[in-house]
Amino acid sequence: GTLAGVEDDVKVSAEDSSYTHPEEVEEFVTRTGCDSLAIAIGTSHGAYKFTPEQCTRNEQGILVPPPLRFDVLEEVSKRLPGFPIVLHGSSSVPQAFVDKINAHGGKMPDAIGIPEDELRHAAQLSVCKINIDSDIRLAITASIREYFDEHPDHFDPRQYLKPARQAVKDMVAHKLVNVLGCNGKA
């Protein structure tokens, strides 16, 4: 499969993305000797994982992304029992960060990610690594935008990076304990 989205200098359109074909995973793992397998079940890189046209809207008008393809994950898990599965592009794009960015001069309309309950479900299955880099970037950006909005005369990175580091720590702690099921597994 191929993930849609943008990461570094690589861009894959939604039209060019595809889901993992479970019938191909055993041969792929055997031929490559990989020690984990990143599969495509509907995740996407970046903070704009889905276009508004790919989503529905709830009663409040908030975008609701399409569900992940757990049928693909379950079939891959049956074919590769116990094999470590990875999900790239799995940031939840917390709306609190998006709202804070927008409130402090940012422009991130319709940024949406993977719902935490779906990530929690994936972590309970055979997924052992869930990549959430965009959530880290959003935590940092929201904190720094808020800081400079409240302290426009400051310029010392030690001042604005301190709350940014704390925002990342808090978000990662929440994800590890409440979403990814990593608490006590170090």
What are the roles of these predicted feature ranges?
Residues 103, 114-186:
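C-terminal alpha-helical cap/extension of soluble enzyme domains
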Residues 1, 42, 89-91, 135-137:
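Short, ordered loop/turn segments at secondary-structure junctions
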Residues 1-84, 95-100, 104-112, 116, ...:
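Alpha/beta enzyme core
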Residues 86-90, 128-129:
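A short beta-alpha structural unit
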